[in-house]
Amino acid sequence: MRDPSSLYAGFPVGSQYESVEPPSLALLSSIYQEQVPAAPGHSYEQCAQPWPPLYREGGTWSPDRGSMHGLSPGTQEGSCTQAEGTKDSLGGDETLSRKSKKKNYHRYAKPPYSYLAMIALVIQNSPEKRLKLSQILKEVSTLFPFFKGDYMGWKDSIRHNLSSNDCFKKVLKDPGKPQAKGNFWTVDVSRIPLDAMKLQNTALTRGGSDYFVQDLAPYILHNYKYEHNVVVYAPHHMPSHASSLPLAEDPHQTNTGGKLNTSFMIDSLLNDLQDVDLPDVPRNIESQRISPAVAINNMWSSAPLLYPQSKPTRNGRGPGFSASHSTYSSSSSSISTISPVGFQETQERSEDLLGRQTQRLGFPTKRPREDDGCSTPSSDTDAGNYSPTEPPKKMPLLSLDLPTSYTKSVAPNVVAPPSVLPFFHFPRFTYYNYGPSPYMTPPYWGFPRPTNPGGDSPRGPQTSLDLDNMLKTVPPNKSVFDVLTSHPGDLVHPSFLGQCLGSSGSPYPSRQGLM
């Protein structure tokens, strides 16, 4: 660890520190004993390290002139190793000698500076302002004794910081061999974060130690000043107005760079939404500021109306409402889009949308609203000036339209059976070998018997399904598939068992066998 007369001493620029005798590490032992562990039986008075002062004649760590020639590695080697060798030669304890051999280096406290600052410090104080990797490692270990000894993990940290920070630039020794080793590294001081050059918050600095320079910027920048109208980390692809902001205007952007102007910012997203046609939202920005009372009362949204098949569907909110939104709203709760009728309606809506593209910028027009089969001109405008407390009127259900969530009367939920025959639990019998069971016959549900009822005798396999007759026998709110699979244990009605399985000579299995 360097003493107060070295780089760690925080003296102002221009001052001179005169020392008759270089202070030893004993002065620092009382401050941070845990950070600088002492070897047993040794005195730090005998291990004084002659560090050159900061502004002494021949010393080179000055902000005005950056040179490292005054710091020779020979003068910075401590005498602790020699003292240990002398004590061992004089017949010291064998246990102590074994411990000293096991730990053959003195572990100093880790310097409270970032690797970026230490690398930039040694590069900027070199004669040519550039160094190789081996030279950087040598100068850092010479300047900070923590990196001496058997600890080698800090070298990987040096390599990582050189390659990951964009302030360090590689200068090829031979441009024809970019992959060759031995290249030089320089530093761009304009891209160094200001916080990276300051004293870091470590356990050593939190202990109240004042023997470290608070800021290494004077020793790295060398009277270089940041331009206040240029952001330090402004990317090259950013617009000019973002990089021309003063650095001191926003305290949060002192070292993190300018504000990113991307498509994910809330301002850009709000600007994009202004050009989107939304339902019940006027395009004027000022008209979007609606009072809370009006917003609460306007709780009824306009529902899509049902129109006859011969007339195309029109938009209910004027040119500001998209026809595609109406198509989505009217078809989201039904399956009419997969039917031929729904396909024709969709095609007619698309043609009507193309015809209305030229009227989007024109004056608002009125449309006739069809209510209960009467086509009367409505007094409402395209902006939808209906009563906010009353729900919109709806068209009655037409025979050609499927029911939706907006219809007042819903037809029975009758659907066609699946194309594949449902699973039958009797593998010995086919689906049509015993004729229609009483469970599926009209008398069981109370319906009138069809004109041509099927006999109870077994039939042969049929080639197709008669959907009309099957749908007539289906009860309300039931489907063919529900009847066949909702109660697997009741597929065979008791009347069927009485008719077909009552006689002992019947070829079919008995009731106990089926159960």
Swiss-Prot record:
Q: What ranges does the record give for the region Disordered, renumbered to this chain?
A: 55-103, 307-399
Region entry SMAD-interaction domain (SID): which residue ranges? Answer: 377-503
Subcellular location per the Swiss-Prot or TrEMBL entry: Nucleus
* Keywords for the protein's UniProt record, in alphabetical order: Activator, Developmental protein, DNA-binding, Gastrulation, Nucleus, Transcription, Transcription regulation
The residue numbers the entry assigns to motif Fast/FoxH1 motif 2 (FM2) are: 412-418
Q: Does the keyword Secreted apply?
A: no
What sections of the protein cross the membrane? none
Q: Where is this motif: Fast/FoxH1 motif 1 (FM1)?
A: 402-406
Polar residues bias located where?
73-84, 375-388
Q: Which GO terms describe its biological process?
A: activin receptor signaling pathway; cellular response to cytokine stimulus; gastrulation; positive regulation of transcription by RNA polymerase II
Molecular function in Gene Ontology: DNA-binding transcription factor activity; RNA polymerase II-specific DNA-binding transcription factor binding; SMAD binding; transcription cis-regulatory region binding
Q: What is its main location?
A: nucleus
Motif stretch (SMAD-interaction motif (SIM)): 467-488
Q: Which CDD domains match?
A: FH_FOXH
What role does this protein play?
Transcriptional activator. Recognizes and binds to the DNA sequence 5'-TGT[GT][GT]ATT-3'. Upon TGF-beta induction, forms a transcriptionally active complex with smad2 and smad4 called activin-responsive factor 1 (ARF1), which binds a site on the mix-B/mix.2 promoter called the activin response element (ARE). Binds to activated smads and the ARE with much lower affinity than fast3. Necessary for the first steps in mesoderm specification, directly inducing mesodermal genes. Acts with fast3 to control the convergent extension movements of gastrulation.
Q: What is this protein called?
A: Forkhead box protein H1
Source organism per entry reads Xenopus tropicalis (Western clawed frog)
